[in-house]
UniProtKB/Swiss-Prot annotation:
InterPro entries: AIM23. It comes from the Eukaryota. One of its GO terms (cellular component) is mitochondrion. Residues 389-406 have a biased composition (Basic residues). The keyword Cell cycle does not apply. Its main location: mitochondrion. Keywords: Mitochondrion, Transit peptide. Residues 36-50, 75-91, 407-416 have a biased composition (Low complexity). It comes from Candida albicans (strain WO-1). Residues 36-91, 368-432 are annotated as: Disordered. Belongs to the AIM23 family. It holds the Pfam family mIF3. This is Altered inheritance of mitochondria protein 23, mitochondrial. It is found in: Mitochondrion.
Length: 432
């Protein structure tokens, strides 16, 4: 009986609670009111945020107001790589340079460019290169250059970085140069002739290497000859001249030798040396030691030394006058007593034989004829008078030239007489 009474009481209380909830709709379950509807909850939180009150968890972990943690070095590197890849994704479609076909140009030019493609592919498979321009180095793809290239006019040159010393160049563009750009091959735009010549030399070198591997003796000899010729071209040439040279030998032999050397150089300013020496063996032999055995007394020795010094001084003056005629500059090193060297550099064009007076007269008459034909407004009588006056002037100029030549001959004869007198004195003293 007691259990029934207890159950009845509990059941009656539950019914009262349910009836009270259905009767009063304003009074709601607080758990359901707070967590039942999410949309209402969000509205409540936003309203409370405006007043300053609200959910403390929402305010604490709000992503909008929260500051991010600092990035690590690895994250920074990844971000930089992504930024570098973004512009490459939006670039135009890059063509393989091996698929480009040239309508212009000869077969040799096409073969030369194909060889450059293969060499660039060995260095960089992506065909990324550095182009040499007036403003500096420019990084680009090889196909960009080939699309604008006209093979009938221009060509390409691949420059070896091992032989050339590259210097840092400042470009006007805003792009920054990375360390990886140093590994890219250098290419320069040149003329087609230069490209074909370089390609032919490249093929010749390959053939020579193949023959050397096979063991041919002819190729080795030809290479030795080429090396010797290159060494001769690179080295400065020398002319030996003894102090004891005669006047005739100087005029005939040494003058022709100096003129030939200047003509072979083409008058391009390539310097050469003239060494004035006692002998090939004893180049620096002083004058004091030459006449010790020949002279008996000191007075005779001093006289011979004075005569030798005068001879040497005359020889130096003759050489200087010859160099001035050939339009050359020179610097002197050394001393008359031992050895002297003339470092000579030709200034102008190579020396040539002077043309005859008859050819000059003919050229001048042709110029007069052309000038007279251009001036058609004048009368014939005035033209004839002008011609006669010009002929008179030419005859006077020729007479003056002949007088100058005669004076130069007399001066040379006097110099030769002096030199012959010195030679005679020198020989007389030696015989005594």
């Amino acid at each position: 009986m007691s259990l029934r009474i207890i159950l009845k009481r509990d059941f009656s209380q539950c019914i009262r609670v349910l009836e009270s909830g259905s009767k009063s709709p304003t009074i709601a379950n607080r758990f359901q009111a707070q967590y039942g509807n999410k949309n209402n909850n969000m509205k409540r939180n936003t309203a409370n945020n405006g007043t300053g009150n609200g959910n403390r968890f929402h305010n604490k972990y709000n992503n909008e107001s929260r500051r991010p943690y600092p990035k690590t070095k690895y994250q920074q590197q990844q971000q930089q790589q992504q930024q570098q890849r973004k512009p490459q994704q939006h670039q135009q479609y890059i063509i393989d340079p091996r698929k480009i076909k040239f309508d212009n140009g000869t077969e040799s030019a096409r073969n030369a460019i194909e060889e450059i493609f293969n060499r660039v592919n060995q260095l960089q498979r992506n065909y990324q290169i550095q182009l040499i321009t007036d403003s500096g180095l420019k990084k680009c793809h090889l196909s960009e250059i080939l699309q604008k290239l006209d093979l009938s006019i221009n060509g390409l040159q691949l420059i070896d970085k091992s032989t050339t010393t590259t210097t840092t160049t400042t470009t006007t563009t805003t792009t920054t140069t990375n360390t990886s750009d140093e590994d890219l091959p250098l290419i320069k735009i040149i003329t087609v002739r230069d490209m074909i010549n370089q390609y032919s030399t490249y093929l010749n070198n390959l053939k020579q290497l193949e023959l050397i591997k096979l063991g041919s003796s002819k190729t080795l000899k030809t290479l030795d000859i080429k090396l010797k010729l290159e060494q001769k071209k690179s080295t400065t040439k020398e002319i030996l001249m003894k102090w004891s040279i005669n006047n005739n030998d100087f005029k005939l032999q040494k003058t022709n030798e100096i003129k030939k050397l200047i003509n072979n150089n083409g008058g391009n300013g390539k310097s050469f040396l003239i060494n004035m020496v006692y002998n090939k063996r004893n180049t620096n032999k002083p004058i004091n030691t030459i006449f010790k055995r020949r002279s008996n007394t000191e007075e005779d020795e001093q006289e011979l030394i004075e005569i030798e010094l005068k001879r040497r001084q005359l020889l130096i003056e003759n050489l200087q006058s010859l160099l001035t005629e050939l339009n050359c500059k020179w610097t002197i090193e050394g001393d008359i007593n031992t050895k002297m060297t003339f470092n000579v550099t030709p200034k102008g064009q190579p020396t040539t034989i002077e043309p005859s007076t008859t050819t000059n007269i003919v050229d001048e008459e042709i110029e007069d004829y052309n000038n007279n034909n251009n001036n058609d407004d004048g009368d014939c009588d005035e033209k004839k008078m002008n011609r006669t006056e010009r002929k008179k002037r030419k005859s006077e100029q020729q007479k003056q030239k002949q007088k100058q030549k005669q004076q130069s001959k007399t001066n040379t004869n006097s110099n030769t007489a002096k030199e012959e007198d010195l030679d005679a004195l020198y020989s007389f003293k030696i015989e005594d």
